[in-house]
Amino acid sequence: YDGQHPNLFSPKEEVPHDEFTSIEDINNYLLQHPEVINFIKSNAVNGDMGKALFLMFDEKTEQLAKAIGLDVCFPSAQLRMFLDNKVNTNRIAEKAGVACVPNVLSPVTDYKHLKQVSEKLGESLVVQTPFGDSGHTTFFISNEEEFNTYAEEIIKEKEVKIMKRINCYGTAIEGCVTQHGTLVAPL
């Protein structure tokens, strides 16, 4: 919008920075950028710098936001990271009675071990590491050759989610806990 949109702000000058490797890096860069800090301060109301929402954030983001007086409107980065772990969310879902694709949570040392721990799930498996974005750490494995392609990424994890491969329709479900209850909606 070339600075013309009333609800959008982007700094005009680029400040030297390390290469961005994550959304968190971008947020942290912006929270340290002098133009962004000046913009936030110039829009303060009675000394209140306001509140911030971030798609992704980490402990550094929280520290930077706090340093300029912003209140992050999410649970802590530590809790977000815990809940972003697919192994943890699987355990929470099962505890809450949410039906899950048949699965087992286990470390994997090699293909033979994978087959042993997933024997009840059949020949065609889906293996997910605890963290990943947009399917980059979801692996479809039905033989040793396919396993070997991803072995290093799978074996290095303390625990992975191993699921029976099913034919399903793709969808996303988002949940939000508020003071009024929990909202769950497909997107």
Question: Would you name each region that the model predicts?
Answer:
Residues 1-82, 111-112:
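ATP-binding N-terminal substructure of ATP-dependent carboxylate-amine bond-forming enzymes
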Residues 13-20, 102-110, 139-142:
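Short acidic-hydrophobic, aromatic-tinged amphipathic segments that line or gate anion-handling sites
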Residues 65, 89-94:
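Structural element of the ATP-grasp superfamily
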Residues 71, 99, 124:
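Residue-level detector of anion-binding/catalytic polar loops
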Residues 92-103:
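A polyampholytic, Gly/Pro-enriched intrinsically disordered region
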Residues 102-103, 125-150, 170-172:
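Glycine-rich phosphate-binding loop of ATP-grasp-fold ATP-dependent ligases
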Residues 117-126:
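Acidic/histidine-enriched active-site and ligand-binding environments that engage anionic O-linkages
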Residues 141-187:
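Phosphate-binding site of ATP-dependent enzymes
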